[in-house]
UniProtKB/Swiss-Prot annotation:
This is Alpha-1B adrenergic receptor. InterPro entries: ADR_fam, ADRA1B_rcpt, GPCR_Rhodpsn, GPCR_Rhodpsn_7TM. It comes from the Eukaryota. This alpha-adrenergic receptor mediates its action by association with G proteins that activate a phosphatidylinositol-calcium second messenger system. Its effect is mediated by G(q) and G(11) proteins. Nuclear ADRA1A-ADRA1B heterooligomers regulate phenylephrine (PE)-stimulated ERK signaling in cardiac myocytes. The chain crosses the membrane at residues 46-70, 84-105, 116-141, 162-184, 202-224, 296-319, 327-351. Belongs to the G-protein coupled receptor 1 family. Adrenergic receptor subfamily. ADRA1B sub-subfamily. It is a multi-pass membrane protein. Residues 1-45, 106-115, 185-201, 320-326 are extracellular. It comes from Mesocricetus auratus (Golden hamster).
């Protein structure tokens, strides 16, 4: 044995042990039990926490408002809005179960809940994001059907079919997101305080295709077809409406009672005018579908802008390490996708007055009491109200045509003057309603008018509890003239176009024999 070698080995052992000991505590490949926590920057933690906390709170409140708006307003319960509610549910689930823990990770700089919960968090993240974009894919298909087949839409897209489509969305989202929980992921890091999205190359490619690129292709194809169909159909229908308006010769106002609404429709058919089969009705329904498509097109556009950078960076960084972005850039891209969850509750009220009014009623705690006022407004510009007293009555219309269109979707504006006939709400028709009474109006009737009948003494400004009647606009004169005056049976109509405001005021005493 060489003593020098033995001596050298023995003298170097303590030094080697010291180096090994230091490496265990400070080396880069440290274990979870020996790792040290990163130093917390209090100022940065507070500022980031406040910003992300406000963002998460806004996303939660906004998506709850969207859900309650549809739940508390019967006229918003349409198949299209069911898809919107499903999108809000996905964003709400993301805001409750994913974003708080993502914000904690950003504030503290490390994961505090262990490896198992990290895997669950990542899977729920993929689930919610996939459900969101698949909901947008279903919305785009729904909008194409609504624009392409606007008259047949209620029979093609029923509530049952919409619910089945929503269930399919969540089933597909679960299939795409469950892979990492079943072991389809990269090996877990040694440090349990590290947590992030799965970057296993093939799963990253699979999830990007299933969660984003394939639905995105469907969305773009559907909205391109919507644009083509909308442009062609609008041109054809507007041309038909102008031709129909030129052939119209009269403006008829009728009072409908509860029991004789169908008789009123038959009287209009006898004059050769069928509101339900007119081109104007088709244009109105098509315009409503096209407006909804525009609103949801904005939603889809913002979703693409928010999530496209992430779904570009994730597969490229997983497949090619040289193309992986810096951590700071990846965090910004990551949270940009999350930011989409609070955008939709902003887009809906800005693009739809129905959602805006629903939001205001809910914020004012008027979810239930607002229903009755909404029904009154639905009569609005195209349905006037009359409550009889002894032998007189009060007939008043002060709702603009535009507001009535936004509330009920049953009136038209612009060139859409021929209105679909719709029964008044049964809740506003008293018992013992009288037969319909035909009235007439000045031929130069314009939107934004105010009609009134004399009120009996002592009853001014008061509403009577008697039966409520409505009369609706069923036609339009070809040109001003005296034909209406000759057949009005004593009604005195005058125009009021002061200051360039279209409208008229008319005093029309009702015939006593009708009540």
């Amino acid at each position: 044995m060489n003593p020098d070698l033995d001596t050298g080995h023995n003298t170097s052992a303590p030094a080697q042990w010291g180096e090994l000991k230091d490496a265990n505590f400070t080396g880069p490949n440290q274990t979870s039990s020996n790792s040290t926590l990163p130093q917390l920057d209090v100022t940065r933690a507070i500022s980031v926490g406040l910003v992300l906390g406000a963002f998460i709170l806004f996303a939660i409140v906004g998506n709850i408002l969207v859900i309650l708006s549809v739940a508390c307003n019967r006229h918003l319960r349409t198949p299209t809005n069911y898809f919107i509610v499903n999108l809000a549910i996905a964003d709400l689930l993301l805001s409750f179960t994913v974003l708080p823990f993502s914000a904690t990770l950003e504030v503290l700089g490390y994961w505090v809940l262990g490896r198992i919960f990290c895997d669950i968090w990542a899977a729920v993240d993929v689930l919610c994001c996939t459900a969101s974009i698949l909901s947008l894919c279903a919305i785009s298909i729904d909008r194409y059907i609504g624009v392409r087949y606007s008259l047949q839409y209620p029979t093609l897209v029923t509530r049952r079919k919409a619910i089945l489509a929503l269930l399919s969305v969540w089933v597909l989202s679960t299939v795409i997101s469950i892979g990492p929980l079943l072991g389809w992921k990269e090996p877990a890091p040694n440090d349990d305080k590290e947590c992030g999205v799965t970057e296993e190359p093939f799963y990253a490619l699979f999830s990007s295709l299933g969660s984003f690129y394939i639905p995105l292709a469907v969305i773009l194809v559907m909205y391109c077809r919507v644009y083509i169909v909308a442009k062609r159909t609008t041109k054809n229908l507007e041309a038909g409406v102008m031709k129909e308006m030129s052939n119209s010769k009269e403006l008829t106002l009728r009072i409908h009672s509860k029991n004789f609404h169908e008789d009123t429709l038959s009287s209009t058919k006898a004059k050769g005018h069928n509101p339900r089969s007119s081109i104007a009705v088709k244009l109105f329904k098509f315009s409503r579908e096209k407006k909804a498509a525009k609103t949801l097109g904005i939603v889809v556009g913002m979703f693409i802008l928010c999530w496209l950078p992430f779904f570009i960076a994730l597969p490229l960084g997983s497949l090619f390490s040289t193309l992986k972005p810096p951590d700071a850039v990846f965090k910004v891209v990551f949270w940009l996708g999350y930011f989409n969850s609070c955008l939709n509750p902003i887009i809906y009220p800005c693009s739809s007055k129905e959602f805006k009014r629903a939001f205001m009623r809910i914020l004012g705690c008027q979810c239930r009491s607002g229903r009755r006022r909404r029904r009154r407004r639905r009569l609005g510009a195209c349905a006037y109200t009359y409550r009889p007293w002894t032998r007189g009555g009060s007939l008043e219309r002060s709702q603009s045509r535009k507001d009535s269109l936004d509330d009920s979707g049953s009136c038209m504006s612009g060139s859409q003057r021929t209105l679909p006939s719709a029964s008044p709400s049964p809740g506003y028709l008293g018992r013992g309603a009288q037969p319909p009474l035909e009235l007439c109006a000045y031929p130069e009737w314009k939107s934004g008018a105010l009609l009134s009948l004399p009120e009996p003494p002592g009853r001014r400004g008061r509403l009577d509890s008697g039966p409520l009647f409505t009369f609706k606009l069923l036609g339009e004169p070809e040109s001003p003239g005296t034909e209406g005056d000759a057949s009005n049976g004593g009604c005195d109509a005058t125009t009021d176009l002061a200051n360039g405001q279209p409208g008229f005021k008319s005093n029309m005493p009702l015939a006593p024999g009708h009540f």
